[in-house]
């Protein structure tokens, strides 16, 4: 028994390390999922204080790295670098979590923020938009990806403890994210809800079981509904996924591959390349080597005000060339 308890403790500690790492990379996600997992470890089946302590210890070991990072970047272990940056460029508290009149970007940030500040009405509207996107993006079914989840709530009999745990996880993710001002439903769908992906897939499977049980018994009784499911899955795999991955965001935001192709062809050598404003300059900037390797070019935006003498002094031995990609947008959305 002691050996088994020790093995379980090591696994819980490892799980804590993983959730602490999530907290390090995406703090809010780590708090949500790590906190819910901690409650399950403490109060769920076979839960105990000892198990929760092993899990919490792992969380602290890796999660504390975020506090050290914050301290190095902002001077305070509790102040995030992103919040510090946006406080300086937007307004103090602009990236805060919750409701308030000064939360969010100035000037609506290209119409991505509906109203100044963030309040319950905007949170409700964001949630509605994200749900509408989820019914298409979750499974890639144009007939509605949430249908199986509806079936779970309507017809699933003998709901299990784990079923309700998954409902709680999904609901918590949706509720907590409503308090953040940026929903991003306009660009990439409900990506801030991705923590709810597994619970939603699980509930969809349970909903399909419930739907299947409602069909009459007998030989071949489930052929039709199984065929519908298979056809819908094939549509999601063979039609929706290629479109979503390769077509929907092709040259979206005026990003294009002209600079990448020219770089691959050896056009630039190790020159300092002043690119004309043609599409999104980030298409070129993303190709910059962060260490300014001697055999790689350096891309800069040609603003007409750059001090070329200073550039030559900073990067001796590099030619300065101007490059116009000659690219034109094919999608009016940009």
Give the label of every model feature segment.
Residues 1, 25, 31, 141, ...:
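Hydrophobic/aromatic-rich transmembrane helices and adjacent perimembrane loops
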Residues 4-10, 32-68:
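Perimembrane helix-loop-helix junctions
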Residues 11-26, 37-38:
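Membrane-interface alpha helices of multi-pass inner-membrane proteins
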Residues 17, 56-60, 170-171, 201-202, ...:
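Signature aromatic-anchored transmembrane alpha helix within multi-pass, membrane-resident enzymes
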Residues 19, 36, 58-62, 144-150, ...:
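Transmembrane alpha-helix segments characteristic
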Residues 21-23, 29-30, 51-144, 236-240:
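Membrane-lumen/periplasm interface segments of specific transmembrane helices
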Residues 38-42, 123-167:
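Hydrophobic, aromatic-rich transmembrane alpha-helices
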Residues 220-280:
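Membrane-embedded, lumen/periplasm-facing catalytic core of multi-pass transferases
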């Amino acid at each position: 028994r002691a050996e088994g308890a020790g093995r379980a403790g090591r696994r819980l500690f490892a799980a804590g390390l993983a959730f602490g790492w999530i907290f390090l990379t995406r703090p809010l996600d780590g708090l949500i999922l790590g906190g819910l997992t901690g409650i399950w470890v403490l109060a769920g089946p076979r839960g105990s204080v000892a198990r929760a302590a092993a899990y919490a210890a792992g969380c602290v070991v890796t999660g504390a790295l975020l506090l050290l990072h914050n301290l190095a970047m902002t001077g305070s272990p509790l102040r995030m670098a992103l919040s510090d940056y946006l406080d300086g460029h937007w307004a103090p508290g602009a990236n805060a979590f919750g409701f308030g009149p000064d939360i969010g970007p100035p000037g609506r940030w290209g119409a991505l923020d509906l109203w100044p500040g963030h309040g319950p009405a905007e949170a409700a509207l964001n949630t509605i938009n994200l749900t509408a996107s989820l019914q298409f993006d979750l499974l890639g079914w144009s007939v509605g990806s949430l249908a199986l989840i509806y079936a779970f709530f309507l017809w699933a009999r003998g709901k299990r403890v784990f079923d309700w745990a998954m409902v709680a996880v999904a609901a918590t993710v949706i509720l907590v994210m409503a308090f953040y001002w940026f929903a991003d439903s306009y660009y990439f769908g409900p990506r801030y809800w991705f923590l709810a992906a597994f619970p939603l897939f699980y509930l969809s499977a349970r909903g399909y079981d419930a739907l299947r049980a409602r069909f009459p018994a007998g030989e071949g009784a489930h052929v039709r509904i199984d065929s519908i499911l298979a056809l819908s899955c094939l549509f999601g795999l063979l039609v929706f996924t290629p479109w979503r991955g390769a077509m929907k965001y092709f040259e979206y935001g005026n990003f294009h591959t002209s600079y990448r192709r020219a770089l691959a062809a050896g056009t630039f050598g190790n020159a300092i390349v002043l690119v004309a404003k043609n599409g999104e300059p980030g298409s070129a900037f993303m190709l910059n080597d962060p260490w300014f390797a001697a055999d790689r070019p350096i891309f800069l935006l040609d603003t007409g005000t750059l001090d070329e003498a200073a550039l030559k002094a900073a990067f001796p031995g590099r030619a300065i060339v101007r490059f116009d990609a000659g690219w034109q947008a094919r999608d009016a959305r940009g």
